[in-house]
């Protein structure tokens, strides 16, 4: 990795981590579902979907992928916190909440990524 590539990666990582911190600063819980992790995962997936289309459409240099996809979205989203929350629900015998947490996080994240790609494709084609 060259110096400028590192700068792109680091800048995206710092911004993504900062936004994640701000969103997860005060835990949001609906029934037993930890919504703050869901929010960062869905937002990150949507932004990644938008970026994928922009990157393809504009033939963006790989440094922008380091910034947006790997740095920003990678630091914003959180598989480890999702896994921890799910593990805690399992350990507390909250099986319904566990199933809901998994289905909602995975389903909405995939839906958000597809939605971001679809929205950006529509905007670009018009």
From Swiss-Prot:
GO terms for biological process: cellular detoxification of fluoride. GO terms for cellular component: plasma membrane. Keywords: Cell membrane, Ion channel, Ion transport, Membrane, Metal-binding, Sodium, Transmembrane, Transmembrane helix, Transport. It holds the Pfam family CRCB. Its main location: membrane. Belongs to the fluoride channel Fluc/FEX (TC 1.A.43) family. Fluoride-specific ion channel. Important for reducing fluoride concentration in the cell, thus reducing its toxicity. PANTHER family: FLUORIDE EXPORT PROTEIN 1-RELATED (PTHR28259:SF1). This is Fluoride-specific ion channel FluC.
């Amino acid at each position: 990795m060259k110096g400028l590539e590192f700068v792109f990666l680091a800048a995206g990582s710092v911004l993504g981590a900062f936004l994640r911190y701000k969103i997860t600063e005060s835990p949001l819980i609906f029934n037993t579902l930890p919504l703050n992790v869901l929010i960062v995962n869905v937002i990150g997936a949507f932004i990644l979907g938008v970026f994928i289309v922009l990157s393809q459409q504009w033939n963006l240099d790989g440094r922008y992928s380091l910034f947006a996809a790997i740095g920003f979205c990678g630091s914003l989203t959180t598989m480890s916190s999702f896994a921890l929350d799910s593990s805690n629900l399992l350990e507390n015998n909250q099986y319904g909440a566990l199933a809901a947490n998994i289905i909602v996080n995975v389903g909405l994240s995939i839906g958000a990524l597809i939605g971001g790609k679809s929205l950006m494709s529509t905007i670009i084609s018009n």
